[in-house]
Every structure is written in structure tokens, then in C-alpha cells.
């Protein structure tokens, strides 16, 4: 018979693998952004929230906070690098200085917060249990924020009736990630993991429901937009051809005058 600890270990490894693919899931979105050289209506909030989540979980996994948590440090350290790359690409292709300043200020605030939290925990909390509880509680809050961050995107989907700016891959991998980590934490109950990942599972389910609901209307909108672009090109080309024909006619047509015959008495 397989022991619960063995199952939990396997789920933990699977969770790390899925988390890695979760970090990579926005890659098609950023490839699209790079090709168009514009972030269009994509929001930076999911990536900023994920960066914050990775920062606090990396702190949680440190030996002086929660010993024997190498997997936690590894996967969240990788997550930090990936999210920083995404945010840099967003800064490069976002529209307007105001948006760039806003994103930079949020990143700076996150770094300052984690630095202050690290200093306070290491100086005021003198046991692993207390440090783990404090940092774990903070992780719980920011994990919930990470899963709640797509709410802004979901609002846009409902408003525009288009899922064009809500990547399916990200929603699907988020669902798988939430299910795996919820199951992992239920074997040896850990509220710091169960609560945020249960909410993450629910959030991902809602996103997939919205995707199924508005997928057809999205395709219609995309088709109409392409048709309008094609029509505009035809009109522009037709207008250019007409002007060319008119100009050619003016240049080659002789100017004739009708002279009245002399009047005879």
C-alpha cells in the first residue's frame, strides 16, 4: 500500500512541474506582444502579483525561516526570473510613460516590502515556528491576491464580450496547478496552501467558463475587424487607382473649343 507521505511527495513534485509551466504559460501572449510591438489591452497586474507571490514564498523557503524547503526556493526563484522578464517586456512595449512609471513603482514597492519583512522577521521572531507562521500568513495573503488578479481581466471580458485578452493557456494551467496543490495540502492539512489554492481553482474555473461563453462572440469580433481592415485597404487602393486614372485623363485628353460659325445676314 502506498503511504500518504509518498503520495504527497509525488503531488509536490507534480505541483512544481505544473508551477513551472504556469510561469511559462503567458509566453504566447508575450510573443504576440513582441510581434505587434504593443501590449494593447493586456494588464500587467497578473505578472506583478505573481512576482510578489514568488518573492514572499522564496523568503518562506529560506533555511532561517522554514528549513528543508529547497523545492519551494527553487521553483519560486525560477518564477522570479521569469516574471521579471515578462515585466521588462511589458515596460518596453506598453503605451505611455504613465503606465511605465506605475509598473516600476509597483515593483519597487514589492521589493521594499519583502526587504522590510525579512528584516523584521529575522530580528523580532526567534523561532522557526514563529517565523514560518508570520511569513506563511503573508504568503497566504499574496497567494490569494495572485489568484484574484485576473478579476480585472475577467471584468474586461464581460464588458467587451471578448476573451482575446484572457489567455486560455494561463487559465487552464492555473486550474491544474490549483487542483494539484490543494490535493497536496489536504493529505497533511496545511491551511497556508489549501486556502489560496482552493480559491485559485475556483478563479480558474470561472475564467474557463467565461472563455467557453464568449469564445464564439470573440471569433465574430475578430472576423468583423479583419473584414473592416480588408475593406479599408480595398477603398484606399480603389481611391488611389481612381485618382491616377483621372490625372492620366487630364494629362492626355485634348482641350477642344467649339467655335460658333459667323453670322450671315
Locate predicted features.
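Alpha-helical membrane-protein topology signature
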Residues: 1-265
